Regions:
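Conserved SAM-binding motif I beta-strand of class I
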Residues: 136-141
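Conserved Class I SAM-dependent methyltransferase catalytic core
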Residues: 207-262
Length: 263
């Protein structure tokens, strides 16, 4: 991996985003999506963007170099236009720990992986670029902005990732997967009617969205598959935890829990 090339790519991408942002009077993230579209189809009257794209293509970045450049771009955007907490990308330290766990757990060399709440796609690309496994990946994401970001970035990178838009809590037509992962969005799910279909549903308040996603995930998991969730440390002690533990006892085998301590 060439860090000088990553830095140059970051500089070129940032200039393009800023030029497009000023031209279209739009926000940072929509400008980034637009820049990705221009990179792919070459249709623009912005000469500086065309020139920068020629330079970008001459760098011949690897997929991991592209990922790092986009990661820095998203971090730059967050300085002026912060994403909500549930939309921020999973840190690399956790991503690489997940890769180690996946490579150790999964026996087969070819696996299918479903990510529920794929966000910006950074975790997906971290895994696809660095795992020893051959992975058939699908990411499911409800947010319009995030699905456009992740899909356009993946196409620029030449990634094998596929993304679909949908509410992961609602029923989806998906094939069963060997592995399911989710950096769980934490909070309440607003639709009590949908939530009432689940065993983890609360009868007294909105149900935790992360509990619903865990239950839903197992519906798409092969019998001998694994689900890996990044969850809050108070998962098993929160007010609705008894509902979750009751469901876990009847429907899943808990292999391990790893706690990350915050400073």
């Amino acid at each position: 991996m060439n860090f000088e090339k990553i830095e140059e790519a970051y500089t070129l991408l940032l200039e393009n985003v800023q030029v497009i942002q000023n031209k279209l009077s739009t926000n940072f993230y929509d400008a980034l999506i637009e820049q990705n579209g221009i990179y792919l189809d070459g249709q623009t009257d912005l000469e500086i963007v065309k020139k920068n794209h020629q330079t970008l293509k001459s760098l011949k970045l690897s997929r991991e170099e592209w990922r790092r450049a986009y990661q820095f771009i998203l971090m730059k955007g967050a300085q002026t236009e912060p994403l909500q907490a549930n939309h921020q990308f999973t840190p690399d330290a956790i991503g690489f720990l997940l890769i180690f766990i996946i490579d150790q757990l999964m026996v087969a060399s070819d696996i299918t992986l479903l990510e529920m709440g794929s966000g910006t796609g950074n975790l997906a690309e971290t895994i696809l670029n660095n795992s020893q496994k051959e992975i058939d990946y699908l990411g499911l994401e409800i947010d319009d902005l995030l699905i456009d970001l992740s899909a356009s970035i993946a196409e620029v990178m030449g990634s094998k990732a596929h993304f679909a838009q949908g509410d992961a809590v609602r029923p989806q037509v998906l094939k069963e997967s060997d592995l399911i992962i989710s950096d769980l969005p934490v909070g309440y799910y607003p639709d009590d009617q949908i939530a009432s279909r689940y065993q983890v549903a609360s009868q007294t308040e909105h149900t935790y969205a992360h509990h619903l996603l865990m239950e839903q995930a197992l519906k798409y998991l092969k019998v001998d598959g694994y689900a890996i969730f990044l969850a809050p440390n108070h998962l098993l002690t929160s007010p609705q935890s008894d509902l979750l533990k009751s469901w876990l006892k009847d429907n899943a085998s808990l292999v391990a829990m790893i706690a990350f301590f915050s400073m």
